[in-house]
Amino acid sequence: MFDFSFPTPASAGTRMGPASCGGRSLHLPQLRFSRVDATAVTDVPFQRMHAPHRAPEVFCSRSSRGAGRGHPTPTPRVRWALAGNQPRCCAQLLSGRGGSGAQLRAGWVRGAAVGNLFILLLGKEDGEEEGTVLSYSSMVHISNITGIVGTTVSRTKPALVLMELTF
């Protein structure tokens, strides 16, 4: 990296050492420094330290947004949602543990995602005839939540079923 050799006869007439930079000369041998050596100093190949193996976290993220940024997304506890065909009904999100779940207004769901599918299921007024709803599924994007929506025909009215919910 450094060359501590004495000056060569070819360079004997030039000023060298710290005195050439304005400092006092201590009559030390010339210290030659090259840019290649400078990069070599900083390019020391340290051994990569691996973190100890740990059990997989409860959190996961299957979306590109938020994945690997230090903010893990919780594994969704919501498994499915069911809604009737009335315009003011709510889609009830039922947790996998059988809890009461959270209420999600149907109008918000309809405005956020699939359009005609939700309007067909949730936009009927009282007294209208119910059409035949075929089994259908599509991807729904609500904010950062992606769900697979299917329809099913019950004995009296069609229902919306959110079969899978991912974050």
Curated annotation (Swiss-Prot):
Residues 1-21 are annotated as: Disordered. This is Uncharacterized protein TMEM132E-DT. It comes from Homo sapiens. The gene is TMEM132E-DT.
